[in-house]
């Protein structure tokens, strides 16, 4: 892994560069506060938890006001040989074998993290669009 190059990658990503759909924006609003330990772990790898590479469509629980995001993917610069799969609370984090192509110059790999149980911001987003 190349933590410094990973940090540079995330420093260049603005919120408006992320998917603008309500589901992704809801995740970005809530994930860091809901999962501070995961955010801290990802930050130790150079990853900004609020700048996902890819988000798998969530399942909404209307009765409880939460969504389950099964997989959130993040890019890490460098070689994956020194990355180790881990689990933080209920969140499993490992190397992805299924992801879109990244428009990133240089060696990199993608990690999967999930399942994230995230509050639905009905006050801010319409999830019926």
Regions found by a protein language model. Give the residues of each.
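Predominantly extracellular/secreted and cell-surface proteins with exposed
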Residues: 52-56, 60
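Glycine-rich, aromatic-bearing surface loops/beta-hairpins
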Residues: 96-129
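Primary mode marks residue(s) on the alpha4-beta5-alpha5 output face of response regulator receiver
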Residues: 47-50
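Residues in well-ordered beta-strands of folded domains
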Residues: 22, 77, 119
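Generic structural motif
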Residues: 26, 79-83, 123-125
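Short flanking/linker segments adjacent to small metal-binding domains or redox-active Cys/His motifs
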Residues: 59-104
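N-terminal cysteine/histidine-rich coordination modules
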Residues: 1-44
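Residue-level marker of intrinsically disordered, low-complexity segments enriched
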Residues: 1, 74, 89-91, 109, ...
């Amino acid at each position: 892994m190349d933590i410094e190059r990973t940090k540079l990658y995330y420093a260049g990503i603005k919120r408006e560069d992320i998917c603008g759909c309500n589901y992704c924006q809801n995740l970005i609003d809530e994930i860091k506060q809901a999962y501070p330990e995961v955010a801290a772990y990802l930050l130790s790898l150079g990853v900004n938890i609020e700048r996902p590479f890819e988000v798998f469509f969530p399942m909404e629980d209307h009765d409880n006001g939460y969504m389950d995001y099964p997989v959130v993917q993040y890019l890490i610069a460098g070689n994956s040989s020194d990355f180790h799969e881990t689990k933080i609370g209920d969140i499993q984090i490992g190397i992805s074998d299924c992801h879109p192509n990244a428009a990133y110059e240089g060696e990199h790999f993608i990690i999967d993290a999930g399942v994230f149980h995230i509050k639905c911001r009905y006050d801010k987003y319409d999830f019926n669009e």
